Swiss-Prot record:
Belongs to the ATPase alpha/beta chains family. It comes from Marinomonas sp. (strain MWYL1). It is a peripheral membrane protein. It catalyses: ATP + H2O + 4 H(+)(in) = ADP + phosphate + 5 H(+)(out). Transmembrane segments: none annotated. InterPro entries: AAA+_ATPase, ATP-synt_VA_C, ATP_synth_F1_bsu, ATPase_a/bsu_AS, ATPase_alpha/beta_chains, ATPase_F1/V1/A1_a/bsu_N, ATPase_F1/V1/A1_a/bsu_N_sf, ATPase_F1/V1/A1_a/bsu_nucl-bd. This is ATP synthase subunit beta 2.
Amino acid sequence: MSSGHIVQVIGAVMDVEFPRDSVPKVYDALTIEGKQLVLEVQQQLGDGIVRTIAMGSTDGIKRGLVVENTNKPVSVPVGTKTLGRIMDVLGNPIDEKGPIGEEERWSIHRSAPSYAEQSSSNELLETGIKVIDLVCPFAKGGKVGLFGGAGVGKTVNMMELIRNIAIEHSGYSVFAGVGERTREGNDFYHEMTDSNVIDKVSLVYGQMNEPPGNRLRVALTGLTMAEKFRDEGRDVLFFVDNIYRYTLAGTEVSALLGRMPSAVGYQPTLAEEMGVLQERITSTKTGSITSVQAVYVPADDLTDPSPATTFSHLDATVVLSRDIASLGIYPAIDPLDSTSRQLDPLVIGQEHYDVARGVQMVLQRYKELKDIIAILGMDELSEEDKQTVNRSRKIQRFLSQPFFVAEVFTGSPGKYVSLKDTIRGFKGILDGEFDDLPEQAFYMIGSIDEAVEKAKKL
């Protein structure tokens, strides 16, 4: 084991000098004597000096402290012992339940599966959320992104998906909280405990109050645990909240590492850093990883480099819209902006495809007619257009749905709607079977049968 000493400290970044014949490799983990702090080597600057990122607070660290090289990258516990536990970026338990007792530790830096090992499937994953199952269906072993600005419901949608999929799906899940609020992490833990699925979930948290090193690596820690389950031949669910904070942590340390900023101040290595993470989140012939990632959209601008870089890696994109949220329609998913590779008649069947496209067509037509209605009023429209507007307002309300995870706030019980019922409901509205029902009957309900019941009471 070689040792060196600290020569410079700039926030989360430190330079350490080693003898020239024993310079650590890039990504090696270093430990500081007498301190509970791990450093990760990022660059070799020459003359035996390496530049490192601290995986924790650098308070009280000074020049001259002795640093030991562990000669291996950061490794974390993997396997079934991690289930039901909360860990930090280094795999240390933070739930006060004693040591993890793992049988195996894996390095958080691993190469992505080769092209020959990868596999894809067309099997659909039912979520029980009408708007998702209809217009942007998820594939088993696929990657999904939830895009949205501040406060439109990314985390709530994510929680509902976890609840519906993790409870219906009997496999294991891994949740990585990357740079989000500790309160949300806490709520999530209690939600999982109350639903009795905590013993099937591994939780890894690196929250917003932590140094950038933790937030930059915590996604890799969670991913490593998911990869272990996948390589054992299981179907794993991998949830990340929030991918944007992973990019942001990279931006925070990028300038300190001496790189020139690129577009909008992001790191020049943005696409590569995103690729390193996303290329590993994939399904192989042994097992699958189905991932759901929340992506914060700065200032509601989807062309910002960070969300724009994420788009290209995904199979389905769910876009949350502030305009829809302001109408009081939750989940605030935009059915015209959200897309999925699975929306193909060969994959989902002709009926589902026709209903989904029919819904989008009616909503798009309503969008075009809005200006005319605003200027001239409804009376100036043709009978056909009036019918389209009425149906599209019903569809818009029928796309809303009470969530299980929001029961405490809304007071109305959550609803899980099967794909069959979803298609039947929207098909009925498009075919005019429910033209006589008032539009309020379609708001915040589950299946179409509830609309008929609700209309009787109105």
